[in-house]
Amino acid sequence: MGKGFGDLPESLKYLRPFAITGVVGPNFPTQSNNVTFNADTGETEIGQNPKTLTWGFTLQYSLIYLQSFVKDIGLGAPFNRMILVTEFPMETCLSADCKGQITGTVNPGIVWVGKYTEFGLAAQIPINSRTGKSVGVLGLIHFFIDDLFPKSIGAPIFH
């Protein structure tokens, strides 16, 4: 689900390129336990697979929308095709020993959108020690197959 702010009044026109999206959903494991064999110790280890709730949201600012529908502020390529994005993907444990604990990251980044592809780059910052201790990097390469092949893959199935 999401909401763009293109309907804001003229006095708030520079906020119109903002959008927020969100997601929430339960995760149920197909097996309640994992059984692993430790070759070093010769012991069998049993770990629980908890039920979790995945939730999160993104905050986005589209420089494409700003340039096209609010005001052309003179951004040149490649900046006029960028979207500033911060993702907040989270997971809450609902069962087992981790019940109530939250893990997640904050992922500030940018996405460049072209006619046939988009590229993105973001930092991945853990929100707590359960999530991790180091900052990571996320990359995105997305090809718009329907635009690359509009007469075959991109064509309607039924006419």
Language-model-derived ranges and their functions:
Residues 6-18, 64-82, 147-159:
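Short loop/turn motifs that connect adjacent beta-strands in outer-membrane beta-barrel proteins
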Residues 47-55, 80, 90, 100-106, ...:
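Residues that define the transmembrane beta-barrel architecture of outer-membrane proteins
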Residues 57-61, 134-159:
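Outer-membrane beta-barrel "beta-signal"
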Residues 13-24, 55, 69, 82-86, ...:
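Transmembrane beta-strands of outer-membrane beta-barrel proteins
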Residues 24-30, 63-65, 88-94, 114-116, ...:
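Transmembrane beta-strands of outer-membrane beta-barrel pores
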